[in-house]
């Protein structure tokens, strides 16, 4: 199952007088949607849920700003790369935010503001895709694993000369896994399936989104650990990898400029109640 929570922080009046309002005060509309991509490309064991949030401008007379959040869970297993591509295409095509999906906004807490009655009227009568937004955030268990038996590519998207990252084997990966050294984990980043598919000569998936470079952040694999085991106790039943991701894109982005700036990207290694490690990020939106 999938669930997505979107929170907006309130700021007290003394923090907002003469300055931009807090995000909670600026929310004009929230629409939600979901799509199943599991069995028969319709069942909900795989798929995505999304929320489209419209915020009024922080500057008087400025444009509204739209942030769209999508939580996805794509097909599992190392070999199912093409299935993951197909499921993401289905999400892009079928995750639609129509006027009927508008949600009632929860009231802000007193004494921050004097609340008006909640409304479920849509801002406009149009339906929108996940790309009809200023900022898009995609998160969840995307299930892209490590690719063995093939050459790697530069995680930064630079041209990769043949032989730069020679093929690795399952044994190579497991040897690195036994050491659990962050610098050695970085050496596996060129073999991340998501990176290889994004930077293929003809990009195959998610090339419009920014994917944090694991060789820069030195994040250990987020999967597969022994649930309720030691903090760094990887399972030998699966190859480790980075299926759990936070990606983003902005309509203001240009070549070499992602617009959204990442201040922190990390995994929570102390969480041991699952065979996955949660991933968190702090990003700054452009003014």
Predicted feature residues:
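Catalytic lobes of large eukaryotic enzymes
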Residues: 18-21, 42, 49-56, 62, ...
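Residue-level marker for the onset of beta-strands and adjacent loop->beta junctions
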Residues: 3, 47-49
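Active-site-proximal beta-strand elements of phosphoester/diester hydrolases
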Residues: 5-6, 32, 65-76
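Active-site surface patch of divalent metal-dependent phosphodiester/phosphate bond hydrolases
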Residues: 1-42
């Amino acid at each position: 199952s999938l669930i997505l929570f979107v929170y907006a922080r309130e700021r007290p009046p003394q923090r907002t007088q003469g300055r931009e309002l807090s995000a909670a005060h600026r929310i004009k509309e929230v629409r939600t949607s979901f799509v199943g991509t599991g069995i028969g490309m319709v069942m909900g064991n795989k798929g995505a849920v999304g929320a489209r949030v419209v915020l009024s401008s922080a500057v008087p007379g400025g444009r509204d700003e739209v942030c769209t959040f999508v939580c996805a869970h794509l097909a599992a297993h190392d070999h199912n790369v093409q299935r993951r591509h197909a499921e993401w295409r289905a999400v892009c095509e079928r995750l639609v935010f129509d006027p009927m999906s508008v949600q009632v906004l929860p009231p802000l807490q007193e004494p921050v503001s004097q609340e008006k009655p909640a409304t479920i009227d849509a801002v406009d009568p149009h339906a929108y895709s996940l790309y009809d937004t200023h900022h898009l955030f995609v998160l969840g268990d995307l299930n892209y694993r490590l690719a063995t038996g093939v050459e790697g590519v530069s995680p930064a998207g630079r041209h990769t000369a043949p032989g730069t990252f020679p093929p690795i084997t399952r044994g190579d990966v497991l040897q690195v896994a036994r050491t659990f050294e962050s610098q050695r984990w970085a050496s596996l980043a060129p073999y991340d399936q998501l990176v290889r598919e994004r930077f293929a000569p003809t990009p195959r998936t998610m090339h419009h989104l920014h994917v944090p470079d694991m060789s820069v952040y030195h994040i250990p694999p987020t999967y597969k650990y022994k649930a309720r085991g030691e903090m760094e106790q990887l399972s030998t039943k699966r190859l480790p990898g980075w299926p759990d991701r936070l990606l983003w894109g902005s309509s203001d982005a240009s070549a070499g400029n992602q617009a959204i700036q990442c201040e922190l990207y990390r995994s929570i290694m102390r969480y041991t109640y699952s065979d996955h490690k949660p991933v968190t990020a702090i990003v700054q939106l452009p003014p």
